[in-house]
C-alpha cells in the first residue's frame, strides 16, 4: 500500500533506496527522522580515535560512498534532506558545536526520545554524541548502544561497534508499507478521542473487558480508514 510518509506511525518499517528504515518522528518542518533497520557491523566511530563526529571517518563515509549508493538506488530525485546536527556532549559541553550532514548517527537525545520504537538488534552501534570533549580531557570516548538497547561508551577507534545510519526524509515521500509493518498509529490525540468516545458510550461506567476490547477495535478501525482516505488524497 502506498501512503505519504507523514501519515506513517512511529515504528513503521518501510523500504527506500534499497534499504529498510524505521519511522522515528515527524517534525513541523515537513521532515521525518528515520533510522536504518539493521546495523552495518564493524565500523569505528573514527579511525583516528577522535570523538568529534564533525571530523570523524564515520561521518565522511556515511555522507560519501554510503550516501552515493543510496542516491543511486533511488534512480531519480531523492528525498534525503540535509540537517544541522547538534553535537553537544553527553555531559552538556558544547565545544563540538554542530555539523551539516545528510546521513548521520543518532544523537543521544534523538535516541532517548525514540527508544520506545527503535527495534533491538544483535550488534552494538555508535551514536554521534561524545562522552565529553577533548578540552575536558576526553577526546576518545563516544556513546554507543548495546544490543539490549542500553547506552555505554567506547574508544572511538574500536570496530567492535557498527553504524546504524539515520536521516531526515521529506515527509511528502510516498512509501510502500506491508501488512504488519505498521503499528496502530494511535498517538496521544487519537488516544484521547478513543477514551472520550468510550466514556460517552458507556456513560462513565466500567465496561466489561470484552465490551472495552470490542469498542476499541471498532474505533481503531475507524481511525485506520480515515488515515487511508487522507493518504489516498495526498
Where do the protein language model's features map onto the residues?
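Intrinsic low-complexity, intrinsically disordered segments enriched in polar/basic residues
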Residues: 124-127, 216, 230-232
Amino acid at each position: 500500500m502506498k501512503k505519504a510518509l507523514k501519515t506513517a506511525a512511529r515504528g513503521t518499517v518501510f523500504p527506500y533506496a534499497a534499504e529498510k528504515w524505521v519511522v522515528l518522528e515527524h517534525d513541523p518542518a515537513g521532515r521525518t527522522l528515520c533510522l536504518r533497520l539493521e546495523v552495518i557491523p564493524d565500523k569505528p566511530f573514527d579511525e583516528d580515535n577522535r570523538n568529534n563526529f564533525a571530523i570523524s571517518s564515520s561521518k565522511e563515509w556515511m555522507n560519501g560512498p554510503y550516501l552515493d549508493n543510496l542516491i543511486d538506488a533511488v534512480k531519480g530525485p531523492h528525498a534525503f534532506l540535509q540537517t544541522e546536527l547538534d553535537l553537544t556532549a553527553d555531559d552538556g559541553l558544547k565545544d563540538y558545536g554542530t555539523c551539516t550532514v545528510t546521513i548521520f548517527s543518532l544523537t543521544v537525545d534523538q535516541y532517548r526520545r525514540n527508544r520506545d520504537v527503535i527495534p533491538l538488534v544483535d550488534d552494538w552501534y555508535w551514536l554521534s554524541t561524545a562522552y565529553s570533549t577533548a578540552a575536558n580531557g576526553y577526546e576518545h570516548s563516544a556513546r554507543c548502544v548495546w544490543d539490549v538497547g542500553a547506552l555505554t561508551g567506547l574508544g572511538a577507534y574500536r570496530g567492535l561497534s557498527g553504524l546504524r545510519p539515520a536521516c531526515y526524509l521529506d515527509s511528502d515521500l510516498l512509501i510502500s508499507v506491508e501488512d504488519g509493518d505498521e503499528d496502530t498509529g494511535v498517538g496521544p490525540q487519537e488516544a484521547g478521542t478513543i477514551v472520550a468516545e468510550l466514556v460517552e458510550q458507556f456513560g462513565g461506567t466500567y465496561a466489561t473487558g470484552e465490551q472495552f476490547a470490542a469498542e476499541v477495535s471498532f474505533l481503531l478501525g475507524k481511525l485506520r480508514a480515515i488515515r487511508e482516505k487522507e493518504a489516498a488524497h495526498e
